[in-house]
Amino acid sequence: MAQVESMEISIQTHDFNLSEEVALLEQDNAIDGAVVTFTGRVRNQNNGNHVTGLTLEHYPGMTEKSLAKIIAIAKERWNIGRVKVIHRIGELNIGEQIVFVGVTSKHRQDAFAANEFIMDYLKVQAPFWKKERTNKGEMWLDAKDSDQNKAQQWD
């Protein structure tokens, strides 16, 4: 039986159902024994500030191309099957889901590594902009040095 391969990218304002996304990764996929997912959510604290929400913006068209390139690199490096990336944009409140990365593979090692790689590169290479609403006002956030360093470890 051949590896089940697919790539799906969704940039959306509406929330997603984690259980449904996992079920779609598993659907008609008897070859892959591993499904690894990451879900990022809006936290209520950042750098000592009380966060009340986020505004996420993106560069339409370019964001999807950037994510497709990141996934293509992951598919070259690891033996993975299906990949799904969902990233929300717009106004998000505390506890809401921001991002989903799901990866299937025959074995867990490839699925874990590819999932982490995709998320690390998404944080620094995909054109998203984040404005944080805090008890001290609103501010646009720059990419963190720690995110840059984490992504560079894959090079």
Question: Which sequence ranges carry the predicted segments?
Answer:
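N-terminal, polar/charged subdomain of small-to-medium soluble alpha/beta proteins
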Residues: 1-97, 113-116, 120-155
